[in-house]
Curated annotation (Swiss-Prot):
Most abundant protein in virion. When expressed alone can form virus-like particles in transfected cells. Plays critical roles in virus replication, from virus entry and uncoating to assembly and budding of the virus particle. M1 binding to ribonucleocapsids (RNPs) in nucleus seems to inhibit viral transcription. Interaction of viral NEP with M1-RNP is thought to promote nuclear export of the complex, which is targeted to the virion assembly site at the apical plasma membrane in polarized epithelial cells. Interactions with NA and HA may bring M1, a non-raft-associated protein, into lipid rafts. Forms a continuous shell on the inner side of the lipid bilayer in virion, where it binds the RNP. Pfam families: Flu_M1, Flu_M1_C. InterPro entries: Flu_matrix_M1, Flu_matrix_M1_C, Flu_matrix_M1_N, Flu_matrix_M1_N_sub1, Flu_matrix_M1_N_sub2, INFV_M1. GO terms for molecular function: RNA binding; structural constituent of virion. Residues 165-252 are annotated as: RNP-binding. This is Matrix protein 1. The keyword RNA-binding applies. Gene3D superfamilies: 1.10.10.180, 1.20.91.10. SMART domains: Flu_M1_C (SM00759). GO terms for cellular component: host cell nucleus; membrane; virion membrane. Belongs to the influenza viruses Matrix protein M1 family.
């Protein structure tokens, strides 16, 4: 796996799924391929994105700044600085300085990532802030190692939280989660359907599924009524894809 592929993988792992994630993935691909060279426009676009947490925006802004060539005097962005200040906690800043001193002696991506993984996400973000604010300089490879370690820490805690929700025995939460997934799947089907003749059928199925979820929420149905809802939708989607000559099995 190339270095940039690894960075893209880690960064995207902390972005919530949805149309915005696809958009960010495209921007990262363009930046890493050298196709997007307007850092100012890129940062303005990032700043105004909804849904993303300030820290995720800060990390993305840091990655864009590392990758896109820019004039030396280009102003640092406040939204990135605020996100990478370790919540203003002096302990985070102390640890960040210690980490920075270690990273300065490191030259490889994997070496830097290994060192950084023993620090908390707050200290890692503060260390990124030091580098972003030009208070310290490390090689790009080392900076990317720091980014990936931070994303791994964040993704770990997100995964724990997700696992808790999936494993919950509370029927109401499970019911709502199944309806949310069915609704999201229906939305994705509508986007994939396009404008072909067969698309009308897929659109109709997706639309009916969304109306059904709305009705279930409006009248308050039994928690078991949503069982299999998403899987039924996915079966319909795969039937439609086969007719279109597309073979993509791994949606479940």
């Amino acid at each position: 796996m190339s270095l940039l592929t690894e960075v893209e993988t880690y960064v995207l792992s902390i972005v919530p799924s949805g149309p915005l994630k696809a958009e960010i993935a495209q921007r990262l691909e363009d930046v890493f391929a050298g196709k997007n060279t307007d850092l100012e426009a890129l940062m303005e676009w990032l700043k105004t994105r909804p849904i993303l947490s300030p820290l995720t925006k800060g990390i993305l802004g840091f990655v864009f700044t590392l990758t896109v060539p820019s004039e030396r005097g280009l102003q640092r962005r406040r939204f990135v600085q605020n996100a990478l200040n370790g919540n203003g906690d002096p302990n985070n800043m102390d640890r960040a300085v210690k980490l920075y001193r270690k990273l300065k002696r490191e030259i490889t991506f994997h070496g830097a990532k290994e060192i950084a993984l023993s620090y908390s996400a707050g200290a890692l973000a503060s260390c990124m802030g030091l580098i972003y604010n030009r208070m310290g300089a490390v090689t790009t490879e080392v900076a990317f190692g720091l980014v990936c370690a931070t994303c791994e820490q964040i993704a770990d805690s997100q995964h724990r939280s997700h696992r808790q929700m999936v494993a919950t025995t509370n029927p109401l939460i499970r019911h709502e989660n199944r309806m949310v997934l069915a609704s999201t799947t229906a939305k994705a089907m509508e986007q994939m359907a396009g404008s072909s003749e067969q698309a009308a059928e897929a659109m109709e199925i997706a639309s009916q599924a969304r109306q059904m979820v709305q009705a279930m929420r409006a009248i308050g149905t039994h928690p078991s009524s949503s069982t299999g809802l998403k899987d039924d939708l996915l079966e319909n989607l795969q039937t439609y894809q086969k007719r279109m000559g597309v073979q993509m099995q791994r949606f479940k």
